[in-house]
């Protein structure tokens, strides 16, 4: 049964002697191979040679401290709400008497976890934070053997005392 009345006539063209022995195809393939031989190699020897990161690269998270060493995070939860991967978990608590040197505001994050396996490193948490507490550094997230090691708590996230929180010049866009 014919569905259309269009038909195409196929002509069986006779191949020449050169086409039958595939010499032109072999020569053109060798020319392509030889042209790639003299181009710059894309592969680098990784441990010895490392490429520079892009200017806007986002790596490992840091919870920043202020000049007095107090945590900037006030557990407002905007970073967790803005995270499209739902990788951030926050539990808020009130600052107790005598903890003024540890936390900047009355409310602080008693639990702050980022699941690095879920995180897509989009930087929305950094942009949403009104206190500039969350910061994405240029540091790579190290490889681990267990999944639970990729859930970073405050022990891995809080900026160590006496270190700079701005190793790169990239600043997130804020209005």
UniProtKB/Swiss-Prot annotation:
<feature type="domain" description="4Fe-4S ferredoxin-type 2">
    <location>
        <begin position="110"/>
        <end position="139"/>
    </location>
</feature>
<keyword id="KW-0408">Iron</keyword>
<keyword id="KW-1003">Cell membrane</keyword>
<keyword id="KW-1278">Translocase</keyword>
<keyword id="KW-0520">NAD</keyword>
<feature type="binding site">
    <location>
        <position position="73"/>
    </location>
    <ligand>
        <name>[4Fe-4S] cluster 1</name>
    </ligand>
</feature>
<feature type="binding site">
    <location>
        <position position="79"/>
    </location>
    <ligand>
        <name>[4Fe-4S] cluster 1</name>
    </ligand>
</feature>
<keyword id="KW-0874">Quinone</keyword>
<comment type="subunit">
    <text>NDH-1 is composed of 14 different subunits. Subunits NuoA, H, J, K, L, M, N constitute the membrane sector of the complex.</text>
</comment>
<feature type="binding site">
    <location>
        <position position="125"/>
    </location>
    <ligand>
        <name>[4Fe-4S] cluster 2</name>
    </ligand>
</feature>
<feature type="binding site">
    <location>
        <position position="129"/>
    </location>
    <ligand>
        <name>[4Fe-4S] cluster 1</name>
    </ligand>
</feature>
<keyword id="KW-0411">Iron-sulfur</keyword>
<comment type="function">
    <text>NDH-1 shuttles electrons from NADH, via FMN and iron-sulfur (Fe-S) centers, to quinones in the respiratory chain. The immediate electron acceptor for the enzyme in this species is believed to be ubiquinone. Couples the redox reaction to proton translocation (for every two electrons transferred, four hydrogen ions are translocated across the cytoplasmic membrane), and thus conserves the redox energy in a proton gradient.</text>
</comment>
<feature type="binding site">
    <location>
        <position position="76"/>
    </location>
    <ligand>
        <name>[4Fe-4S] cluster 1</name>
    </ligand>
</feature>
<protein>
    <recommendedName>
        <fullName>NADH-quinone oxidoreductase subunit I</fullName>
        <ecNumber>7.1.1.-</ecNumber>
    </recommendedName>
</protein>
<dbReference type="GO" id="GO:0005886">
    <property type="term" value="C:plasma membrane"/>
</dbReference>
<keyword id="KW-0830">Ubiquinone</keyword>
<dbReference type="InterPro" id="IPR010226">
    <property type="entry name" value="NADH_quinone_OxRdtase_chainI"/>
</dbReference>
<keyword id="KW-0997">Cell inner membrane</keyword>
<dbReference type="GO" id="GO:0050136">
    <property type="term" value="F:NADH:ubiquinone reductase (non-electrogenic) activity"/>
</dbReference>
<keyword id="KW-0004">4Fe-4S</keyword>
<dbReference type="GO" id="GO:0051539">
    <property type="term" value="F:4 iron, 4 sulfur cluster binding"/>
</dbReference>
<dbReference type="GO" id="GO:0005506">
    <property type="term" value="F:iron ion binding"/>
</dbReference>
<keyword id="KW-0677">Repeat</keyword>
<keyword id="KW-0472">Membrane</keyword>
<feature type="binding site">
    <location>
        <position position="122"/>
    </location>
    <ligand>
        <name>[4Fe-4S] cluster 2</name>
    </ligand>
</feature>
<keyword id="KW-0479">Metal-binding</keyword>
<feature type="binding site">
    <location>
        <position position="119"/>
    </location>
    <ligand>
        <name>[4Fe-4S] cluster 2</name>
    </ligand>
</feature>
<feature type="binding site">
    <location>
        <position position="83"/>
    </location>
    <ligand>
        <name>[4Fe-4S] cluster 2</name>
    </ligand>
</feature>
<dbReference type="InterPro" id="IPR017896">
    <property type="entry name" value="4Fe4S_Fe-S-bd"/>
</dbReference>
<dbReference type="InterPro" id="IPR017900">
    <property type="entry name" value="4Fe4S_Fe_S_CS"/>
</dbReference>
<dbReference type="Pfam" id="PF12838">
    <property type="entry name" value="Fer4_7"/>
</dbReference>
<comment type="similarity">
    <text>Belongs to the complex I 23 kDa subunit family.</text>
</comment>
<dbReference type="GO" id="GO:0048038">
    <property type="term" value="F:quinone binding"/>
</dbReference>
<feature type="domain" description="4Fe-4S ferredoxin-type 1">
    <location>
        <begin position="64"/>
        <end position="93"/>
    </location>
</feature>
<dbReference type="GO" id="GO:0009060">
    <property type="term" value="P:aerobic respiration"/>
</dbReference>
